[in-house]
Design a protein with these regions (language model features):
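Conserved adenylate-forming
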Residues: 14-27, 32-76, 98
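Alpha-helix N-cap/helix-start capping motif
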Residues: 29, 106, 128-129, 156, ...
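Structural core segment of the AMP-binding/adenylate-forming
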Residues: 1-10
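Gly/Ser/Thr-rich phosphate-binding loop
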Residues: 98, 121-126, 135-197
Length: 197
């Protein structure tokens, strides 16, 4: 092959002859998502295409007046194997054309904050522990948060003291959600414009 394009053309033509289309329905299994094991051993939750797409549609209705399609810059600091991050950061924000900034090691606070300073992010998702970690950084507290539209807390309860410090530092409320792996994951979430309670 002279280049990658030639290889891809050959591969696509070969696949057209050898592969047949697979018919899927909304009730077909999309993935097995493992739970966090907070109440015992980790279990595989069966999630269908309909489960995941329903959650994405619910998210779309929830945030539609707060976002601009294709213009959001989202901080993805939670692991994508966690259902909260997988659904919200990857599936939803990718679906609407957002730019996801993947933080591969959020425990490396110095580099995490350095990355946050580099991008004018509009959304961040985190757990209480991560919000607290960021608030310990004097460099983080000096970031310009003018573009930050909302912060979503999930995966564990966000403490009121954390939410108050976050609001004071960023000018942005933490919007708390609740869910389970088995529900792919969102069950309920507060309104973005509401004060934390």
């Amino acid at each position: 092959f002279n280049n990658f394009r030639e290889f891809m053309i050959l591969w696509i033509n070969k696949c057209k002859n050898e592969l047949s289309e697979i018919k899927l329905s909304g009730d077909d299994v999309a993935l097995l998502q493992y739970t966090g094991g907070t109440t015992g051993k980790s279990k595989a939750a069966i999630l269908t295409h309909k489960n995941l797409l329903s959650n994405i549609n619910q998210l779309s209705l929830w945030v539609k007046s707060h976002i601009k399609i294709g213009e959001e810059v989202v901080i993805t600091a939670l692991p994508l194997y966690h259902i909260f991050s997988l659904t919200v950061n990857l599936l939803y924000f990718y679906y609407i054309g957002s730019r996801n900034i993947l933080i591969t090691n959020p425990r490396d606070l110095k580099n995490f904050v350095k990355t946050l300073k580099k991008y004018e992010f509009t959304v961040i998702t985190a757990v209480n522990t991560l919000f607290n970690l960021l608030l310990t950084s004097s460099v983080f507290r000096k970031i310009n948060f003018n573009k930050l539209k909302f912060s979503i807390g999930g995966g564990m309860a966000v403490l009121k003291s954390t939410a108050n410090k976050w609001k004071k530092t960023t000018g942005c409320e933490i919007t708390q959600g609740y869910g389970l792996t088995e529900t792919s994951p969102i069950v309920s979430v507060n309104k973005i414009e509401d004060k934390f309670n």
